[in-house]
Amino acid sequence: MASKSIHKKHQENSQQDKNQFSVHHYLDPNQSIHALISCSEKKYEKNQNQKKNPLPSSYYHQKRNPGSSAHSPYGSVDESSRTAVSPAMDMVSNQAPIHTRQVSAPNLHTSVNNGQSSATVPHPSHHNVHHQHSKSVSALPMTIGYSPVPSHVKSVSHEANYSYAGLSEIPQQQGMMQQNREKSLSLDPMRRPFMTPQDVEQLPMPQGWEMCYDSDGVRYFKDHNSKTTTWDDPRLKQQEQTGFGLGENIGQNRYNNCYDNGHSSRSLPSIHQHQQMIPNHPQPQYSSQQQMDYIQQLQNERMMIQEKNAQLINSGLVDSPQPPYQAISPMSSTMMHSHDPNFMYQQQQQAQNSQQQQTPHTLHQIPNQYQNSQMNDDSAMEVDYSMVSHPQQLQHQHQPHMHNNMPSNYVIDDINPHEFDQYLQISNDNNRGVGSMVHHYQ
């Protein structure tokens, strides 16, 4: 019975299925995962669009409002901002052509009277605007009756020059620019306004001058024209005479002060020391007559030194405490004894005796004997000029022995040369710099 009832029930259900539809809904467990993936893809597409268009669309489709420039990128500099940047710009009419860089240039000169109105100042026309090419940019204010301010040599401004009432400032400033350009064109030391010691070293020595160094390495200068030595550089004096530059006197004073401060305790060295340092230096060539004059003058000076030595010994100055003396040059000693009657008498007596004692065998003597005897007897005069044998020159070679014919009160044999050197030796380090800055040598 039960089976029949079940079979009957199935038949009824089958009949009902033919007329009715049943809808079954199945939930996908992966549905949430697919939704997340799709959302991420959509976000990625939006980011790509933003990178391609970084600015919003309103920026590209913005309405231009000429009245208000506060929200426009093209109106960042309006009339009020221009007035704030440069007060002098309010006098320039908007109708006149203005340089594009003149708007942002600051006001460098405030000499314009604030009470002047814009109507009294004529507006610059387009033909009066001139631009000068340079590295910097500036705008000159419109001043009336004022000359242009000179600029630095290395700073030439890019200026807009205006002409007022037919008067133009361009020729003056162009001349100034050309003058500055001329000063900077040449690097020649002869054209510089200020001569430095480095520039002086590059200049050639004048004619007849020679630069030498003593045993201590101190530089001095020899003038073969006047037979003098000096510490001063003759090239600086030549610059003063020729008149190149404006600040050369100051440069020479600074150079000499710096040089004298470092070597104030030094005096001029002797010629003999310089020749020992540089033996291969070419000596100046002189004629026979000039050499005879030099030999005669050296002999006279030697006799004067011997006379001075005898006077010092007779007066007792050698045994007493020795005060500091100045370095005596040959020319100063000559001036000191020029008015002495005893000295004049000795000169005449020596000239007569030299003529009487001249014999034929003196012509065959070696000239260097006289030079060696002179260098040994007189340590103060260190002269080493080359001598050429000549019959007329050798007639004075017996004069070094003429001190035996001097008056008896001058005891020359008792003289100690080492005690006398402290008075007359020029190359002594303790007496350097005390005497004159210019010394004569023969």
Curated annotation (Swiss-Prot):
CDD domains: WW (cd00201)
GO molecular function, one term: protein kinase binding
Protein's UniProt keywords contain Phosphoprotein: yes
Annotated tissue distribution: Expressed in epithelia, hypodermis, muscles, pharynx, intestine, gonadal sheath cells, vulva, spermatheca and in excretory tissue.
Domain of life: Eukaryota
Disruption phenotype: RNAi-mediated knockdown at L1 stage results in vulva protrusion and rupture of internal tissues resulting in premature death. RNAi-mediated knockdown in middle-aged adults extends their lifespan.
Keyword Nucleus: yes
Function comment: Plays a role in thermal stress response and in aging.
Name of the featured protein: Yes-associated protein homolog 1
